[in-house]
Swiss-Prot record:
Lineage of the organism: Eukaryota, Viridiplantae, Streptophyta, Embryophyta, Tracheophyta
Major location category of this protein: plastid
Subunit structure: Part of the 30S ribosomal subunit.
An example Gene Ontology molecular-function term: rRNA binding
Function recorded in the entry: One of the primary rRNA binding proteins, it binds directly to 16S rRNA where it nucleates assembly of the head domain of the 30S subunit.
Keywords noted in UniProt: Chloroplast, Plastid, Ribonucleoprotein, Ribosomal protein, RNA-binding, rRNA-binding
Cystines in this chain: none
Single GO biological process annotation from the record: ribosomal small subunit assembly
Family per similarity comment: Belongs to the universal ribosomal protein uS7 family.
Top-rank lineage group of the source organism: Eukaryota
Record CDD domains: uS7_Chloroplast
Entry protein name: Small ribosomal subunit protein uS7cz/uS7cy
Length: 156
């Protein structure tokens, strides 16, 4: 733990084409081994496919998908005095929820069958915006787990 004080939170930069911070957050999560230009290519191709599929603004589809997948409540594993572990429901803030939503969308799109990542990502984003898809199932499973363990909420 640092003794110098708390580091100030850095804000995400906006991407060069859409001038949007959310797009840059998604690109940073797509990126592997520092290959940011490849991550931009994947996202921009996915955005083009969304434009072709829905004929609406693809940024609105992206925002809608992330908003639908963002969880309000989650579970955190806690160990009690006897050594058994319990999943305690906790509230999730907006920033952490957005980060989880982006992560879940990318994981669900990677698991999809398909040709390339851009195609899979575009399909997952369109499905999530409509209220279906793997990321939505993940959110619902998390909410179900938190609801089932609601009696343990006082263990925080």
């Amino acid at each position: 733990m640092s003794r110098r004080g708390t580091a100030e939170k850095r804000t995400a930069k906006s991407d060069p084409i859409f001038r949007n911070r959310l797009v840059n957050m998604v690109v940073n999560r797509i990126m592997k081994d520092g290959k940011k230009s490849l991550a931009y290519q994947i996202l921009y191709r996915a955005v083009k496919k969304i434009q072709q599929k829905t004929e609406t603004n693809p940024l609105l589809v992206l925002r809608q998908a992330i908003r639908r997948v963002t969880p309000n409540i989650g579970v955190k594993t806690r160990r009690n005095k006897k050594g058994s572990t319990r999943k305690v429901p906790i509230e999730i803030g907006s920033k952490q929820g957005r980060a989880l939503a982006i992560r879940w969308l990318l994981e669900a799109s990677q698991k999809r069958p398909g040709r390339n990542m851009a195609f899979k990502l575009s399909s997952e984003l369109v499905d999530a915006a409509k209220g279906s898809g793997g990321a939505i199932r993940k959110k619902e499973a998390t909410h179900r787990m938190a609801e089932a363990n609601r009696a343990l909420a006082h263990f925080r």
